[in-house]
Curated annotation (Swiss-Prot):
Mitochondrial matrix-facing ranges: 52-62
UniProt-listed CDD domains: CcO_II_C
Subunit composition and interactions: Component of the cytochrome c oxidase (complex IV, CIV), a multisubunit enzyme composed of a catalytic core of 3 subunits and several supernumerary subunits. The complex exists as a monomer or a dimer and forms supercomplexes (SCs) in the inner mitochondrial membrane with ubiquinol-cytochrome c oxidoreductase (cytochrome b-c1 complex, complex III, CIII).
PROSITE patterns per record: COX2, COX2_CUA, COX2_TM
GO aspect biological process, one term: ATP synthesis coupled electron transport
InterPro entries per record: CcO_II, CcO_II-like_C, CcO_II_C, Copper_CuA, Cupredoxin, Cyt_c_oxidase_su2_TM_dom, Cyt_c_oxidase_su2_TM_sf
Pfam families, sorted: COX2 (PF00116), COX2_TM (PF02790)
Listed name of the protein: Cytochrome c oxidase subunit 2
EC supergroup of this enzyme: translocase
Species annotation: Choristoneura occidentalis biennis (Two-year-cycle budworm moth)
Binding sites annotated in the UniProt record for Mg(2+): 198
Length: 227
């Protein structure tokens, strides 16, 4: 989750989020180089006294300012396209989780198992314990096994919501009457927080999402105990 005084992205908990962070850093380096170059040129123009009153055209400079931006865009577009294809790729998921957005809570169904479904509400401030996070903790967490491919189906019953876990690099719109899907792979145990990322009404800020990542053995025990 996000921490105090942290200006970076959240620590990744999935290979997909790692790739998103790499792309962010790659793009940021290019933007910094462009900013420095443009700043240097502007300062040079302000403080030098050179002038060319007879310059009518400059084909070479026009060629340069056409080719350089094109090359820059290619360097940004190629890794971006690769990442977009990775986002849509489904690799034989072990578990399918269905997430349904409501005003203003989430409900979940484990489609591969019988009778495992529950609602997930934010814990009110007056019921919080000392180790809870304000506006982030819920009464029923999503339990998922780590090091396994997970598919999630997202929909809504009333208005548009958005199911988002930043540390996993996952953000899916929940549209009424439509199923959207994506997949993710959690590569470490832990508790990961997210929130609804689409303004959905008065209590939009009170729709947190919590995933608890555990080993496959503990996940099987949880399934057996829940059933």
């Amino acid at each position: 989750m996000a921490t105090w005084s942290n200006f970076n992205l959240q620590n990744s908990a999935s290979p997909l989020m790692e790739q998103i962070i790499f792309f962010h850093d790659h793009t940021l380096i290019i933007l910094i180089m462009i900013t420095i170059l443009v700043g240097y040129l502007m300062i040079s123009l302000f403080f030098n006294s050179y002038i060319n009153r007879f310059l009518l055209e400059g084909q070479m400079i026009e060629l340069i300012w056409t080719i350089l931006p094109t090359i820059t865009l290619i360097f940004i577009a190629l890794p971006s396209l690769r990442l977009l294809y990775l986002l849509d790729e489904l690799n034989n998921p072990l578990i399918t989780l269905k997430s349904i957005g409501h005003q203003w809570y989430w409900s979940y169904e484990y489609s591969d198992f019988q009778n495992i479904q529950f609602d997930s509400y934010m814990i009110p401030i007056n019921e919080m314990k000392n180790n809870n996070f304000r506006l982030l903790d819920v009464d029923n967490r999503i339990i998922l096994p780590m090091n396994n491919q997970i598919r999630i189906l997202v929909t809504a019953t009333d208005v548009i919501h958005s199911w988002t876990i930043p540390s996993l690099g996952v953000k899916v719109d929940a549209n009424p009457g439509r199923l959207n899907q994506t997949n993710f792979f959690i590569n470490r145990p832990g508790i990961f927080y997210g929130q609804c990322s689409e303004i959905c009404g008065a209590n939009h800020s009170f729709m947190p999402i919590v995933i608890e990542s555990i080993s496959i053995k503990n996940f099987i025990n949880w399934i057996n105990n829940y059933s």
